């Protein structure tokens, strides 16, 4: 767990997300509180619960991105789920406990990756021995092996093709599922794992690859042999329980409006199933039981039709921190195009560079792109920052199509060029409803 201060966390989020200071502050404090909790004595540490967050705001304003960047910054296990994908227990569909099982799988992958770094040097040496074995065989003399080892390290043999045996991660029978209930028992009964243990280890497969590319397979393979798999699982479960972040999107879609009938019953059932998960329960996974008491839950929704007060009172109480994200304005769009770390403009310039085409956007073009995006959001449907992608694709459609034939040329995009390609379309809202 990183020990960034709230100000540093907000500053890092500012590199990728424009505006939404209140939401950034809320998640920054939540992340810092996790670090603070780790500094407490064990008895008190168990009593400090995370303050779950409810984000309210229209689509495309940064709700998901804030959570995703936060998890990346913290190096924490993170899963994003949509509330509408789940059904209450007893109905056909995924049950909410699958969220925790997915979180554990992410934690296992993250932990294994971190632990591999600690044994990478030894794994590299072991991988080198296996490459030599593939090149000269097991019976080669020490002098021959040393000669090939020097060639291998100098890069002379990089393009030579070899055959290697690596662990077969895919295949097998996978997890057992109850028919008609996809996801119901994933991770609890894994027949593939049971068969592998019965046969004394995992399966292998033969891969044909170049010497250079073989290291990618072999280093991972050798790293896993050096790792204590029980320790990987122990650390991963601890990471999921103490550092895990779950982002539940579209929670407004399972809010039952007053007087609602029919599907409202099932939606309320999903809310009731979420209650113990958010408050703290123990979920059985194939790696062992996982407690959710200290998992941070961030729920979000547009709440166009339903209101936060339409959620079950018990669920509202388990989402104590509420932040409202505002709709984006013209200046926000301009800043998104120019100030973010990997802005759309930087992406398109880099993409065209691969074709030998130099792309340049004038300041008035950027302002015009922002204006068109705002106008379309107002007149058609407000999809937030995602509108910029459709506008940019429309503007650069011709350049992208002809780029291979224009290698070595320079293209300047100004306001007139933007108007020429999307101006009329933006004005005709009936038409743009279907095209943009």
UniProtKB/Swiss-Prot annotation:
SMART domains: AAA, ClpB_D2-small. ATP binds at residues 18, 60-65, 249, 314, 386. The keyword Ribosomal protein does not apply. The keyword Chaperone applies. Disulfide bonds: none annotated. GO terms for cellular component: HslUV protease complex. InterPro entries: AAA+_ATPase, ATP-dep_Clp_protease_ClpX, ATPase_AAA_core, Clp_ATPase_C, HslU, P-loop_NTPase. It is found in: Cytoplasm. One of its GO terms (molecular function) is ATP binding. ATPase subunit of a proteasome-like degradation complex; this subunit has chaperone activity. The binding of ATP and its subsequent hydrolysis by HslU are essential for unfolding of protein substrates subsequently hydrolyzed by HslV. HslU recognizes the N-terminal part of its protein substrates and unfolds these before they are guided to HslV for hydrolysis. NCBIfam families: hslU, PRK05201.1. This is ATP-dependent protease ATPase subunit HslU. It comes from Chelativorans sp. (strain BNC1). The gene is hslU.
């Amino acid at each position: 767990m990183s020990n960034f201060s709230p100000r540093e966390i907000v500053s890092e989020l500012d590199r990728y997300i424009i505006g939404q200071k209140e939401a950034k502050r809320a998640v920054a404090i939540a992340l810092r509180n996790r670090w603070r909790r780790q500094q407490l004595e064990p008895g008190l540490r168990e009593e400090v619960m995370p303050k779950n967050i409810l984000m309210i705001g229209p689509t495309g304003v940064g709700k998901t991105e804030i959570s995703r960047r936060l998890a990346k910054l913290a190096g924490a296990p993170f899963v994003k789920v949509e509330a509408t994908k789940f059904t209450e227990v007893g109905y056909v569909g995924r049950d909410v406990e699958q969220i925790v099982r997915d979180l554990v799988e992410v934690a296992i992958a993250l932990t294994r990756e971190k632990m591999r770094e600690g044994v990478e040097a030894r794994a590299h040496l072991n991988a080198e021995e296996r490459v030599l074995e593939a090149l000269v065989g097991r019976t080669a003399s020490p002098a021959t092996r040393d000669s090939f080892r020097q060639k291998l390290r100098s890069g002379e043999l990089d393009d030579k093709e070899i055959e290697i045996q690596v662990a077969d991660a895919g295949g097998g029978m996978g997890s057992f599922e109850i028919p008609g209930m996809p996801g119901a028992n994933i991770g609890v009964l894994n027949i593939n794992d049971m068969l592998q243990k019965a046969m004394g280890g995992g399966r292998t497969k033969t891969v044909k690859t170049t010497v250079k590319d073989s290291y990618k397979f072999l280093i991972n393979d050798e790293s896993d042999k050096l790792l204590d798999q029980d320790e990987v699982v122990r650390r991963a479960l601890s990471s999921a329980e103490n550092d895990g972040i779950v982002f539940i999107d579209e929670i407004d879609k399972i809010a039952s409006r007053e007087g609602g009938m029919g599907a409202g019953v099932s939606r309320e059932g999903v809310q009731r199933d979420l209650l113990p998960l958010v408050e703290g329960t123990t979920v059985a996974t194939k790696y062992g039981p996982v407690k959710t008491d200290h998992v941070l839950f961030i729920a979000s929704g547009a709440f166009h039709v339903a209101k936060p007060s339409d959620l079950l009172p018990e669920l509202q109480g388990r989402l104590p921190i509420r932040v409202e994200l505002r709709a984006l304005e013209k200046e926000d769009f301009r800043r998104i195009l120019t100030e973010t770390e990997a802005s759309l403009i930087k992406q398109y310039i880099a993409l065209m560079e691969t074709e030998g085409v130099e792309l340049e956007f004038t300041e008035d073009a950027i302002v015009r792109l922002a204006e068109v995006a705002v106008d379309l959001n107002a007149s058609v449907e407000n999809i937030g920052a995602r509108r910029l992608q459709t506008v940019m694709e429309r503007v650069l459609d011709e350049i992208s199509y002809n780029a291979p034939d224009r290698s070595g040329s320079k293209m300047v995009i100004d306001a007139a060029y933007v108007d020429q390609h999307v101006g009329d379309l933006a004005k005709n809202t009936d038409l743009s409803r279907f095209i943009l």
